[in-house]
């Protein structure tokens, strides 16, 4: 009976993973809400990780890459979102460092600035609004100032 209950939780987790990728913490939370004991959750997570169905490191790298390139988010927002998903800080930092080598963050910031300032004219108020917008998207003030400086040079 115990084995069958574990299989039930395992199959439940597999069905979740058919629809989208989850972190181990998210799966553990779903199992907890489903009534799984800590021991059963650990067993299911161990089996899923052993078969390669969940991998927080790979998930984090994909999430960071997509967040930079598709969502146009900065490091701070990405970090915050991954923490909400239960990803370990060390994995988050490694993922950000790895992806930053491949992605031109300044280019992303410049694209966002160009979308916000369409006519090319920039008052102090417009620049402040753009800075606030970019900071809300999770970009570093240093990166923002560098990108604004580059635009002014053009």
Q: Model-found features: residue ranges?
A:
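An alpha-helical, amphipathic repeat domain used for nucleic-acid recognition
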Residues: 1-154
């Amino acid at each position: 009976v115990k084995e069958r209950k574990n299989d039930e939780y395992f199959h439940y987790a597999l069905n979740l993973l058919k629809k989208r990728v989850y972190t181990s913490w998210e799966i553990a939370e779903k199992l907890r809400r489903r009534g799984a004991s800590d021991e059963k959750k650990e067993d299911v997570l161990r089996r899923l990780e052993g078969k390669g169905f969940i991998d927080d490191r790979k998930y984090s790298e994909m999430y960071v890459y997509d967040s930079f390139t598709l969502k146009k988010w900065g490091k701070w927002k990405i970090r915050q979102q991954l923490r909400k998903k239960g990803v370990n800080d060390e994995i988050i930092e490694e993922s950000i460092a790895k992806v930053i080598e491949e992605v031109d963050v300044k280019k992303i910031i410049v694209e966002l600035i160009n979308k916000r300032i369409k006519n090319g004219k920039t008052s102090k108020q417009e620049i402040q609004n753009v800075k606030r917008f970019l900071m809300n998207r999770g970009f570093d003030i240093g990166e923002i100032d560098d990108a604004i400086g580059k635009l002014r040079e053009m």
